[in-house]
């Protein structure tokens, strides 16, 4: 095989890899807790794993809480582990209306100036001063994935969600690159319902960098 044939073959393989389906993760409402807040809500009860998640080292815990806002409450909101340095609550726009909380659209971890909420566990209550957000839709990927897809950490891209009979394109999808991440797009339940993505065959494909 000469150089030109090799380059043609490599280009074809890379193009096929760029068109491969991106696994879709639908994020239901959930919480992340720091160690101090966890110990207050679940004293003498070590965090326990219920289900492993796709991202390495992350899991859904057995522990759940009730969120209480000015207008309503949401029960059985699952804790995701492991514990973090700062507590955070991720909900959908629909959830925010149910609670009566003006949760801003933010990237995970960006909680400055965000509203709080009351957390109730089977053992205690805690008034979280801040940390309630609607999570910005995003794609997790490794540096190799980013190289293949021609994107960088912090980029905004357009992604097509291929669900049932509907196909919906989401703009402003944030790219998050880390050696510890696996390729997966995260959307919330409102976005999943709009795209008809509530079936196991649903997947995402990159449309174009923005």
UniProtKB/Swiss-Prot annotation:
<dbReference type="Pfam" id="PF06130">
    <property type="entry name" value="PTAC"/>
</dbReference>
<protein>
    <recommendedName>
        <fullName>Phosphate propanoyltransferase</fullName>
        <ecNumber>2.3.1.222</ecNumber>
    </recommendedName>
</protein>
<dbReference type="GO" id="GO:0051144">
    <property type="term" value="P:propanediol catabolic process"/>
</dbReference>
<feature type="binding site">
    <location>
        <position position="71"/>
    </location>
    <ligand>
        <name>CoA</name>
    </ligand>
</feature>
<feature type="binding site">
    <location>
        <position position="90"/>
    </location>
    <ligand>
        <name>Zn(2+) 1</name>
    </ligand>
</feature>
<dbReference type="GO" id="GO:0031469">
    <property type="term" value="C:bacterial microcompartment"/>
</dbReference>
<comment type="similarity">
    <text>Belongs to the PduL family.</text>
</comment>
<feature type="binding site">
    <location>
        <position position="138"/>
    </location>
    <ligand>
        <name>Zn(2+) 2</name>
    </ligand>
</feature>
<dbReference type="GO" id="GO:0016747">
    <property type="term" value="F:acyltransferase activity, transferring groups other than amino-acyl groups"/>
</dbReference>
<dbReference type="GO" id="GO:0046872">
    <property type="term" value="F:metal ion binding"/>
</dbReference>
<feature type="binding site">
    <location>
        <position position="30"/>
    </location>
    <ligand>
        <name>Zn(2+) 1</name>
    </ligand>
</feature>
<feature type="binding site">
    <location>
        <position position="186"/>
    </location>
    <ligand>
        <name>Zn(2+) 2</name>
    </ligand>
</feature>
<feature type="binding site">
    <location>
        <begin position="26"/>
        <end position="28"/>
    </location>
    <ligand>
        <name>CoA</name>
    </ligand>
</feature>
<comment type="pathway">
    <text>Polyol metabolism; 1,2-propanediol degradation.</text>
</comment>
<keyword id="KW-0012">Acyltransferase</keyword>
<feature type="binding site">
    <location>
        <position position="84"/>
    </location>
    <ligand>
        <name>phosphate</name>
    </ligand>
</feature>
<keyword id="KW-1283">Bacterial microcompartment</keyword>
<comment type="function">
    <text>Expression of a cosmid containing the full 21-gene pdu operon in E.coli allows E.coli to grow on 1,2-propanediol (1,2-PD) with the appearance of bacterial microcompartments (BMC) in its cytoplasm.</text>
</comment>
<feature type="binding site">
    <location>
        <position position="193"/>
    </location>
    <ligand>
        <name>CoA</name>
    </ligand>
</feature>
<keyword id="KW-0479">Metal-binding</keyword>
<keyword id="KW-0862">Zinc</keyword>
<dbReference type="InterPro" id="IPR008300">
    <property type="entry name" value="PTAC"/>
</dbReference>
<feature type="binding site">
    <location>
        <position position="140"/>
    </location>
    <ligand>
        <name>Zn(2+) 2</name>
    </ligand>
</feature>
<comment type="function">
    <text>Involved in 1,2-propanediol (1,2-PD) utilization within the bacterial microcompartment (BMC) dedicated to 1,2-PD degradation by catalyzing the conversion of propanoyl-CoA to propanoyl-phosphate. Required for optimal growth on 1,2-PD. CoA is regenerated within the BMC (for use by PduP) via this enzyme, although there must also be cofactor transport across the BMC. Directly targeted to the BMC.</text>
</comment>
<keyword id="KW-0808">Transferase</keyword>
<feature type="binding site">
    <location>
        <position position="78"/>
    </location>
    <ligand>
        <name>CoA</name>
    </ligand>
</feature>
<feature type="binding site">
    <location>
        <position position="32"/>
    </location>
    <ligand>
        <name>Zn(2+) 1</name>
    </ligand>
</feature>
């Amino acid at each position: 095989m000469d150089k030109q044939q090799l380059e043609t073959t490599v280009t074809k393989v890379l193009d096929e890899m760029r068109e491969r389906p991106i696994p879709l993760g639908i994020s239901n409402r959930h919480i992340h807790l720091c160690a101090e807040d966890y110990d207050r809500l679940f004293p003498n009860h070590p965090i326990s794993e219920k289900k492993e998640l796709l991202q390495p080292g992350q899991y859904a815990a057995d522990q759940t809480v009730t969120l209480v806002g000015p207008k309503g409450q949401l029960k059985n909101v699952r804790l995701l582990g492991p514990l973090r340095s700062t507590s955070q609550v991720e909900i959908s726009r629909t959830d925010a209306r149910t609670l009566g909380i003006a949760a801003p659209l933010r990237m995970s971890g960006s909680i400055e100036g965000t509203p709080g909420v009351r957390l109730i566990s089977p053992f205690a209550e805690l008034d979280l001063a801040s940390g309630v957000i609607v999570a910005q839709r995003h794609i997790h990927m490794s540096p190799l994935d980013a190289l293949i897809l021609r994107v960088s950490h912090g980029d905004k891209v357009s992604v097509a969600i291929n669900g049932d009979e509907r196909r919906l394109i989401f703009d402003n999808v944030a790219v998050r690159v880390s050696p510890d991440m696996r390729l997966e797009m995260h959307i919330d339940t409102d976005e999943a319902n709009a795209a008809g993505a509530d079936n196991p065959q649903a997947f995402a494909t990159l449309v174009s960098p923005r």
